[in-house]
């Protein structure tokens, strides 16, 4: 696959699977410092909100930037912040899929690395990488279709 991409007003020819995280390492293309950063809403702390009188609380999801995962919490119905999603899929699409790939850490006892898929926000593709089996973040999937349907721009939940 060949793509012509413009970055900082410079055309870049992309052949096959292009890994921008490796290509930009150590480069001084000034406009790209925030490249791969999570949106501000994903970095906000959990705020469960305030009670709405006699209405029962509901279960929602927030992105935990420390663990790198979407986690469930009890929302009381009023207030809070934008790190508050009705379902895990919206949380993943808004935050989890925007994390850079993370191969994890070696397990104890050690195990062989396995092939997983991660969503690359630059190319908008699901690519393979080696995962050690322990740790990492939520931007890793066992199957390509899980990656694409959760994170890809071709499908909305």
Swiss-Prot record:
GO terms for cellular component: extracellular space. Residues 42-95, 97-151 form the BPTI/Kunitz inhibitor domain. PANTHER family: BPTI_KUNITZ INHIBITOR DOMAIN-CONTAINING PROTEIN, KUNITZ-TYPE PROTEASE INHIBITOR-RELATED. The keyword Nucleus does not apply. Pfam families: Kunitz_BPTI (PF00014). It comes from Margaritifera margaritifera. Disulfide bonds join 42-95, 70-91, 97-151, 107-134, 126-147. The keyword Secreted applies. SMART domains: KU. It is found in: Secreted. InterPro entries: Kunitz_BPTI, Kunitz_BPTI_sf, Prtase_inh_Kunz-CS, TFPI/VKTCI-like. Residues 1-16 form the signal peptide. Nacreous layer of shell (at protein level). This is BPTI/Kunitz domain-containing protein 3. Keywords: Disulfide bond, Protease inhibitor, Repeat, Secreted, Serine protease inhibitor, Signal. GO terms for molecular function: serine-type endopeptidase inhibitor activity.
